[in-house]
Curated annotation (Swiss-Prot):
Keywords: Chaperone, Cytoplasm, DNA replication, Metal-binding, Repeat, Stress response, Zinc, Zinc-finger
Source species: Exiguobacterium sibiricum (strain DSM 17290 / CCUG 55495 / CIP 109462 / JCM 13490 / 255-15)
Gene name of the record: dnaJ
Compartments reported by the entry: Cytoplasm
Protein name: Chaperone protein DnaJ
Subunit description: Homodimer.
One GO location term (cellular component): cytoplasm
Family of this protein: Belongs to the DnaJ family.
Stretches assigned to coiled coil: none
Length: 368
């Protein structure tokens, strides 16, 4: 079934503030929470609400959703969604709620890593090996936390559920809330003889090397999702995901604007006046560019297809060359003499006609 638009699910405008999104979720969650609404589709509607809120309440996820919708290319096909954590979202507003079985398989935590690359690596794409600290099941006790040859015992207070039930009177009526068992701290089991390697935690921290393929055309701040490269799951659950945020270092010549490249190209007075054919550096290599006579500072030339590749389509943007005319310093006497001679024989009227608007404004400024 095709997913509905998250803004439509919450009944808010696309430019809604964080506070408006929060209010909309609270109102609808009260209506469709399965503990309150006994209709057959209430549970599914509540999951849909919680999924929408989970994305739109997070600035980064909301920005990606606004740009790509449900199919975010940086997610490696995963897109947005998933029902994990919905109980936690409701608990954040209303307290209590239902708890997950502590012995049930749970997905490992997602991780984020920032990788810095050069401008040219962003142009061509690059493969990197990164080292990330992760938590994995202890190899000695295989995640049980118990000393080899022994086994964890089921908590007698909660019967292995990890929580105890407490009845409370609420605005919804009498509701049974589940709270964490204080004896086993939510694990459902008690380790009497802890593993010496992990000291009973069942997990150890280690460094893991991960190979990351960064696609050509990736822009600063974009991220890559590596499914299953996060932390190990709990109780045999799946691994979490790894999100690699790419930072692109600035280039000494080129500036990226979307998929285009902009650069300043210095020209001498003679080149700009008489015209010339010059070599222009691009990320694709050197390109010949004809400079017409009479080129002014601020003139811009376009080199089609010489920009960055689009990370999704592969289509290349353009390169824009901005002309900057360099005024010479430390002239020789002969050069000064020639410039004075040039100035004397120049047609000032012709220059004024070429820049009539500028000269007119200057005269008005002085004469009033």
């Amino acid at each position: 079934m095709e997913k509905r638009d998250y803004y439509e699910v919450l009944g808010v405008a696309r430019d809604a503030s964080a506070a408006e999104i929060k209010r909309a979720y609270r109102k609808l969650a009260r209506t469709y929470h399965p503990d309150v609404n006994k209709e057959a589709d209430a549970d599914q509607k509540f999951k849909e609400l919680s999924e929408a809120y989970e994305v739109l309440s997070d600035d980064n996820q909301r920005a990606r959703y606004d740009q790509f919708g449900h199919q975010d290319p940086s997610q490696g096909g995963g897109g947005f969604g998933g029902a994990e954590g919905f109980g936690d979202i409701f608990d954040m507003f209303f307290g209590g709620g239902r708890r997950q079985d502590p012995n049930a398989p749970r997905k490992g935590q997602d991780l984020q890593y920032v990788e810095e690359i050069d401008f040219m690596e962003a142009f061509s794409g690059v493969e990197k090996v990164i080292t990330i600290p992760v938590e994995e099941d202890c190899g000695t006790c295989h995640g049980s936390g118990a000393k080899p040859g022994t086994h964890p015992e089921t908590c007698k207070r909660c019967g292995g559920s990890g929580h105890i039930n407490v009845e409370q009177n609420t605005m919804f009526g009498r509701v049974v809330n589940q709270t964490t068992c204080s004896t086993c701290h939510g694990r459902g089991q008690i380790v009497k003889e802890p593993c010496e390697t992990c000291r009973g935690a069942g997990r150890v921290r280690k460094n893991k090397d991960v190979r990351v393929k960064i696609p050509a055309g990736i822009d600063n701040g974009q991220q890559i999702r590596l499914a299953g490269k996060g932390e190990a799951g709990v109780n045999g659950g799946p691994f979490g995901d790894l999100y690699v945020v790419v930072r692109v270092r600035e280039h000494e010549l080129f500036e990226r604007v979307d998929d285009h490249i902009v650069m300043d190209m210095p020209l001498t007075f003679a080149q700009a006046t008489l015209g010339d054919e010059i070599e222009v550096p691009t990320v694709h290599g050197k390109v010949s560019l004809k400079i017409p006579a009479g080129t002014q500072t601020g003139s811009r030339f376009r080199l089609r297809g010489k920009g960055m590749p689009n990370v999704r389509s592969g289509h290349h943007g353009d390169q824009y060359v901005n002309v900057v005319i360099i005024t010479p310093k430390n002239l020789t006497d002969r050069q000064k003499e020639l410039l004075r001679e040039f100035n004397e024989i120049s047609d000032e009227k012709g220059v004024e006609e070429q820049h009539e608007g500028v000269f007119s404004r200057i005269k008005t400024f002085f004469t009033g």
